[in-house]
Amino acid sequence: MELFDKVKALTEIQATSGFEGPVRDYLKARMVELGYQPEFDGLGGIFVTKASKVENAPRIMVAAHMDEVGFMVSSIKADGTFRVVPLGGWNPLVVSGQRFTLFTRTGKKIPVVTGGLPPHLLRGTGVTPQIPAISDIIFDGAFENAAEAAEFGIAQGDLIIPETETILSANGKNIISKAWDNRYGCLMILELLEFLADKELPVTLIIGANVQEEVGLRGAKVSTTKFNPDLFFAVDCSPASDTFGDDNGRLGEGTTLRFFDPGHIMLPGMKNFLLDTANHAKVKTQVYMAKGGTDAGAAHLANGGVPSTTIGVVARYIHSHQTIFNIDDFLQAQTFLRAIITSLNTEKVAEIKNY
């Protein structure tokens, strides 16, 4: 399967926080196909263990997260429209005028759009449009009233997830889709598992994907406790700022070196290891000072402290229906992660942990 087809398959899957099943099923099928036996944590994270033959080998964890941002129905109005609570961070300005799918408890899929006030209805009112609260945005399934919505099985607690088509940009260098945060990571771990399938390593690897990252790094807390790694590598996507006049995160500039974010500071040993590995592997990198967090923020606080970092890329307009990301950035990150994993051994892990 070509890279674009893999990206398309993963990004078009609809799976939000607490409803990661469709992505988990996809990952499980691919893991089994590659000859691995996946196991699960208590919240639904999926991982495989590739054990080393080296006695007391260090345990290295590589984790994506499966969930994308979405919404949950909080109320159904008399006119048959819905109001919601967000699952993950949303800018209200990107929500209106979009298409979604509502998933009922029985698995029925209902097309839904978000309503915006047409300019015609504002003329002569003297009203200046305001930024709406998420709780005020109209989600409309075109039902006549609440009773008809109920007949179709719609209820409070149902999930609403963006619906889009993944496409290639005109120049062929970029892809436009939803959910690259974090189907990027999901594709990275599958590609890594395929790369490592016939390799023996001096470290034991735990590779997979967490749940509920977008609502507070919840899955990482559980999985890191369960698998007890010596080092933790999150693979995640962050927002690019290049179209907003900021050099912090630019498309086409390679994988990110994330020395700092609000929930995590990279330890000196890890920083030195990443810089040396990137230089040796001739990987294109960019320093990224993040304003948000990744699962590394939860993992590094687990089990008495786990040196952690994030192997990432940036994308424009994340947490929306239309994200733009660079194909070569993905390939640079892929090369970097492979170099990292194949460089690790007992001595190197001890060096990284020697703060």
UniProtKB/Swiss-Prot annotation:
Catalytic machinery residues: E213
Keyword list, A-Z: Aminopeptidase, Hydrolase, Metal-binding, Protease
InterPro entries: Pept_M42_glutamyl_aminopept, Peptidase_M42, Peptidase_M42_aminopept, Peptidase_M42_dom2
EC number: 3.4.11.7
Coiled coil: none
GO BP terms: proteolysis
Keyword Transferase applies: no
Required co-factors: a divalent metal cation
Domain of life according to the entry: Bacteria
Region forming the signal peptide: none
Pfam families membership: Peptidase_M42
Catalyses which reaction(s): Release of N-terminal glutamate (and to a lesser extent aspartate) from a peptide
Residues engaged in binding a divalent metal cation 1: H65, D181, D236
CC cofactor note: Binds 2 divalent metal cations per subunit.
Gene3D superfamilies in the record: Peptidase M42, domain 2, Zn peptidases
The keyword 4Fe-4S appears for this protein: no
Amino-acid positions noted as binding a divalent metal cation 2 in the UniProt annotation, renumbered to this chain: D181, E214, H319
GO molecular-function terms, A-Z: glutamyl aminopeptidase activity; metal ion binding
Family assignment from sequence similarity: Belongs to the peptidase M42 family.
UniProt-listed NCBIfam families: glu_aminopep (TIGR03107)
PANTHER family reported in the protein's UniProt record: AMINOPEPTIDASE, AMINOPEPTIDASE YPDE-RELATED
The protein's name: Glutamyl aminopeptidase
Protein species of origin: Lactococcus lactis subsp. cremoris (strain MG1363)
Gene this chain is encoded by: pepA
